[in-house]
């Protein structure tokens, strides 16, 4: 027995970088969306996942394939500030929209989108 497909929940972010307007999955409906959850202190994210996202971004026309990045902070919270992420994005030439995952409303370590998607880590 298969269940009915469901729509992916929108990202719950505190801010977006590289986006003149906050992107939403509802607005991108009908297009392929490649989304990457990463943390800038994750070696696998920096070495493999982010370069792959940039390759996808450059290989496909933006009207057909949307690329989004989600910065999920589930550890080392003090080192993962917005200012540090902005410098990181500039240094690594990340031009895709980057959402900063909203923190847990009750102060837990797992941010909201990461929890909504039941992610266990990055990349």
What residues fall within each predicted segment?
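Short, flexible, glycine/charge-rich loop motifs used to bind or transfer phosphoryl groups or to couple energy/partner
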Residues: 1-2, 22-25, 56-58, 87, ...
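Proline-centered helix-kink/hinge sites
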Residues: 9, 43-44, 51, 97, ...
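Short active-site neighborhood of thiol/selenol oxidoreductases, capturing the structured segment around
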Residues: 22-53, 67-68
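Structural microenvironment flanking redox-active thiols in thiol-disulfide oxidoreductases
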Residues: 46-92, 103-110
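Residues that form or immediately flank small-molecule/cofactor binding pockets and catalytic motifs
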Residues: 16-18, 30, 72, 103-104
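N-terminal "domain-start" segment that seeds a small globular fold
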Residues: 1-26, 96
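Loop/turn elements at helix/coil->beta-strand transitions in domains of secreted/extracellular proteins
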Residues: 30-33, 63-66, 93-97, 121-122
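Thiol/disulfide oxidoreductase modules built on the thioredoxin-like
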Residues: 92-94, 100-123
């Amino acid at each position: 027995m298969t269940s009915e497909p469901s729509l992916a929940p929108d990202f719950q972010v505190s801010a977006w970088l590289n986006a003149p307007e906050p992107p939403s999955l509802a607005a991108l409906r009908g297009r392929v969306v490649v989304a990457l959850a990463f943390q800038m202190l994750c070696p696998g994210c920096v070495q493999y996942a982010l370069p792959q996202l940039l390759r996808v971004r450059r290989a496909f026309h933006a009207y057909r394939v949307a690329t989004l990045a989600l910065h999920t902070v589930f550890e080392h919270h003090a080192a993962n500030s917005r200012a540090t992420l902005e410098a990181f994005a500039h240094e690594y030439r990340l031009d895709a929209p980057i959402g900063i995952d909203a923190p847990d409303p009750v102060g837990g370590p797992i941010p909201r989108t990461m929890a909504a998607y039941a992610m266990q880590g990055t990349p």
